[in-house]
Swiss-Prot record:
The keyword Nucleus does not apply. Its main location: cytoplasm. It comes from Homo sapiens. This is Queuine tRNA-ribosyltransferase accessory subunit 2. HAMAP family: QTRT2 (MF_03043).
Length: 415
C-alpha cells in the first residue's frame, strides 16, 4: 500500500492510495469515503442495484459488531468474508462499531473491549479479536481500542489517560499477533487515536501510535454537537500535524457534508458514509447542491426548486429547536410531508441516479405513506449517489483550487 499525494493546499490532501488489496491492483482516491454496509450489504440494496449507483467507493466498511457472532461459520469457510458476502473483488475495512448504533459505556477493561451485536454483548479479548480478523481476512481493520472517551462528554483526565494507555497496549498486542499469523500478513492494521477532549492525551496518542508499524490512523471520538465543533476542530488540527504524511487518516462518526469539509481542511482523508443511510431511514432525500460552478441556464431552471428548499430550512430549524426531530438537517427534504403528494419533479433536477431518472417526489411520498419497501431502495440509491457525487466534486474543487467556493456553498445551505 502506498499513499501518493498530488496536491496539499491549506491542509487539504489530494491524491491516491495505490497497491491496495490482496493482489495490490486497487486504487482509492482521497479525499473520499467508504461504502457503509450492514452485515456486509449496502442497506436496502442488492448487489445488482448497488452496481447501478455511480461513484461507489472502492472500499466497503464492515462492522465487527454485526459479524462477531458469525465468526465460527467464517472460520470454517476459510476464504474470508469478502467471498462469503458476494463481494470478492471489493476492498474491505472492518471497524469495531456501527457508527449509527450507540454502544453502552462501561464495558472496557484492561484485557477486553465489548461490541454489541443483535444478540447482545460480545466481549473481545485481543486473542479473540485477532482470531475473528483471521477468519474475516479484511484488507484493513481497526485495531482494538478503548473508544468510550470522546469529545461528546466531559471526562476526567485520569479516565482519558487510561483510554490512551489501554489503546496503545491493545495495539502492541495486536501487532505482535499479526506478525505471528501468516493469514493476517496481507491485512493492514489501522491504529486508533484516542484522548477525548484533552489536548495533551490526544497528542500523546498520536505520537505513540505513529511510532508503531501501522498502515494508517483512525481519528476516534471527534463526533459531538455543533456547540463543540470549534474545539473539536482545534484538537483535530493538532493531532493531524503529528501524523506522518505518507499514511491515510480516517475519521469515525463524522459524515455531515459541512463537517466533512472542515475535517478535510485539517488533513483527514477518508470518511464513513452512514449519513445517506440515516437520511433514508428518516424518509428523506438529500437535495443539497455541491455544484460550485453551475450552468447559468440550469440555475434558472432550478431556481424555483431551490427557493422551495430555502423556505423549508426555517421549518427544519423550528423542528430542531422544539426537539420533535433533532436529527433532520437542512441538507435534505422530508418526503413524508403532504406537500409532496402532487410534486411530480425528480428528487433533484439534473441528478443522474436511477430514482431521479425514473420516479418523482410524489411517487416516493406515496411509497413512504403506504410503508412500501421500495421507498427505502429508491431513497438509498439516490442518497448514496448524491453523497458519493459530493466527494467527487470535493476532489475536483481541490484540483482547480475552488474548495473555498464549494465550502461557502455548503455552509450557506447548512446555516
Amino acid at each position: 500500500m502506498k499513499l501518493s499525494l498530488t496536491k496539499v493546499v491549506n491542509g487539504c490532501r489530494l491524491g491516491k492510495i495505490k497497491n491496495l488489496g490482496k493482489t495490490g491492483d486497487h486504487t482509492m482516491d482521497i479525499p473520499g469515503c467508504l461504502l457503509y454496509t450492514k452485515t456486509g450489504s449496502a442497506p436496502h440494496l442488492t448487489h445488482h442495484t448497488l452496481h447501478n449507483i455511480h461513484g461507489v467507493p472502492a472500499m466497503a466498511q464492515l462492522t465487527l459488531s454485526s459479524l462477531a457472532e458469525h465468526h465460527e461459520v467464517l472460520t470454517e469457510y476459510k476464504e474470508g468474508v469478502g467471498k462469503f458476502i458476494g463481494m470478492p473483488e471489493s476492498l474491505l475495512y472492518c471497524s469495531l462499531h456501527d457508527p449509527v448504533s450507540p454502544c453502552p459505556a462501561g464495558y472496557v477493561t484492561n484485557k477486553s473491549v465489548s461490541v454489541w451485536s443483535v444478540a447482545g454483548r460480545v466481549e473481545m479479548t485481543v486473542s479473540k479479536f485477532m482470531a475473528i480478523q483471521k477468519a474475516l481476512q479484511p484488507d484493513w481493520f481497526q485495531c482494538l481500542s478503548d473508544g468510550e472517551v470522546s469529545c461528546k462528554e466531559a471526562t476526567s483526565i485520569k479516565r482519558v489517560r487510561k483510554s490512551v494507555d489501554r489503546s496503545l497496549l491493545f495495539l502492541d498486542n495486536c501487532l505482535r499477533l499479526q506478525e505471528e499469523s501468516e493469514v493476517l500478513q496481507k491485512s493492514v492494521i489501522i491504529g486508533v487515536i484516542e484522548g477525548g477532549d484533552v489536548m495533551e492525551e490526544r497528542l500523546r496518542s498520536a505520537r505513540e501510535t505513529a511510532k508503531r508499524p501501522v498502515g494508517g490512523f483512525l481519528l476516534d471520538g471527534f463526533q459531538g454537537n455543533p456547540t463543540t465543533l470549534e474545539a473539536r476542530l482545534r484538537l483535530l488540527s493538532s493531532v493531524t500535524a503529528e501524523l506522518p504524511e505518507d499514511k491515510p487518516r480516517l475519521i469515525s462518526g463524522v459524515s455531515r457534508p459541512d463537517e466533512v469539509l472542515e475535517c478535510i481542511e485539517r488533513g483527514v482523508d477518508l470518511f464513513e458514509s452512514f449519513f445517506p443511510y440515516q437520511v433514508t431511514e428518516r424518509g428523506c432525500a438529500l437535495t443539497f447542491s455541491f455544484d460550485y460552478q453551475p450552468n447559468p441556464e440550469e440555475t434558472l431552471l432550478q431556481q424555483n426548486g431551490t427557493q422551495e428548499e430555502i423556505k423549508c430550512m426555517d421549518q427544519i430549524k423550528k423542528i430542531e429547536t422544539t426537539g420533535c426531530n433533532q436529527e433532520i438537517t437542512s441538507f435534505e427534504i422530508n418526503l413524508k410531508e403532504k406537500k409532496y403528494q402532487e410534486d411530480f419533479n425528480p428528487l433533484v433536477r439534473g441528478c443522474s441516479c436511477y430514482c431521479c431518472k425514473n420516479h418523482t417526489r410524489a411517487y416516493i411520498h406515496h411509497l413512504l405513506v403506504t410503508n412500501e419497501l421500495l421507498a427505502g431502495v429508491l431513497l438509498m440509491m439516490h442518497n448514496f449517489e448524491h453523497y458519493f457525487g459530493f466527494f467527487h466534486y470535493i476532489r475536483e474543487a481541490l484540483k482547480s483550487d475552488k474548495l473555498a467556493q464549494l465550502k461557502e456553498l455548503i455552509h450557506r445551505q447548512a446555516s
